From Swiss-Prot:
It comes from Naja atra (Chinese cobra). Transmembrane segments: none annotated. InterPro entries: Cytotoxin_Cobra, Snake_3FTx, Snake_toxin-like_sf, Toxin_cobra-type. Its main location: secreted. GO terms for molecular function: toxin activity. Expressed by the venom gland. SUPFAM superfamilies: Snake toxin-like. Disulfide bonds join 24-43, 36-60, 64-75, 76-81. It is found in: Secreted; Target cell membrane. This is Cytotoxin homolog Clbp-3. Has low cytotoxic activity.
Length: 82
């Protein structure tokens, strides 16, 4: 019985990502993504305001970058949301 319990605990640990990290797209195309470094739990996408449908940059961040007069930044906190 102890062996079965230990086996279940090990399987649970292996199946769960205990050190969960965010996954964010990291290219203008949404086909490629990266696992973010520890501490960077925000995905962001930067678009030029004149061409909002074309992302300029997608990446991970610890804090959301600021938008400016020329670029719009969209931040989110779920996997591949950017």
């Amino acid at each position: 019985m102890k062996t079965l319990l230990l086996t279940l605990v090990v399987v649970t640990i292996v199946c769960l990502d205990l050190g969960y990290t965010r996954k964010c797209h990291n290219s203008p195309l949404s086909l490629v993504y990266q696992t973010c470094p520890i501490g960077q739990n925000i995905c962001f996408k930067i678009n030029v305001k004149e061409a909002p449908s074309i992302p300029v940059k997608r990446a991970c961040a610890a804090t959301c970058p600021k938008s400016s007069a020329l670029v719009k930044v969209v931040c989110c906190k779920t996997d591949k949301c950017n």
